[in-house]
Amino acid sequence: MDILEQIIATKRRELAGMMAPKRSLKKALADSPTGIIAEFKRKSPSKGWIHADVRPEEVVPAYAAAGAAALSILTDEPYFGGCLEFIRRVRPLVDIPILRKDFIIDPVQLYQAAEAGADAVLLIAACLSREDCAALTAEAHRLGLEVLLEIHDAAELDYIRPEVDVVGVNNRHLGSFVTDVQTSFDLIDGIRRRITAPLRASALRRAEPKLVFRQTCPKNNFGPPAGEATGPIIISESGIGEPETVRALREAGFRGFLMGEHFMKNPDPGAALADFIQAI
């Protein structure tokens, strides 16, 4: 093999991660008994360093072994002490979905996420216009990435579109970084209305067959095919630290819970997650 052939072979290997089938965050949350997205976060703007010296190779596999449904990895460096390389380093170590958590404002960041081995990306409504959010969602899907759309208040409810895979309520105010889990309870009904309206419209369109079809098929054949997705999964993010909070959120209709700081401030984040799961 000459040098050019070696270079081409290397490039093919580099592209393999981007082209490989992705794991579904939405399905993982729907199927999980815990619904916990465990986050690797070393630092935050409000708390400073939470766990400065820890390596993702130590924490992420322990999260997976403890029963996490999926993983969230901060890749912002200045404010959260993360980097994209963290995803590359842990991707071969776990089989559950990885969310790239960052402030994504440009398609280039989607290409980075896909190349690094992420399965899903975070899109923050507060960072994007509605048009840009829709365009980034479409491009993410073209790359095989799922989208977690994050909202913070009722004004952002109209960012929710049927094609979004997961809708998350961030209980942390991005201006003050103060957390209040009540935000999730306040928004859940509005989210449900936004999700179910297009589903109802779609079902009505399906139930408008031609007359001859109506005469030859039983009524109970109308509607979505078996196994078809029924809209985005709803999750709650930030400020969750007690098992009772998870139980209350689950009762309200949330299927997933993104948690990081509660585990990362522990000397053994994986063990902290295992204990938390036992308690819920």
Where are these regions (language model features)?
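Glycine-rich phosphate-binding active-site loops on the catalytic face of alpha/beta enzymes
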Residues: 112-132, 169-177, 254-273
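Conserved N-terminal beta1-alpha1 strand-loop-helix module at the mouth
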Residues: 1-98, 105-108, 139-163, 174-184, ...
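Short, low-complexity intrinsically disordered segments enriched in small and basic residues
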Residues: 196-230
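Residues marking helix boundaries in flexible regions
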Residues: 189-192, 196, 222, 278
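Thr-Gly-centered strand-to-loop micro-motif
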Residues: 74, 100-101, 123-124, 170, ...
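Active-site regions of enzymes building and remodeling cell-envelope glycoconjugates
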Residues: 165-167
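Solvent-exposed, charged amphipathic helical/linker segments at domain boundaries
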Residues: 128-144, 152, 169
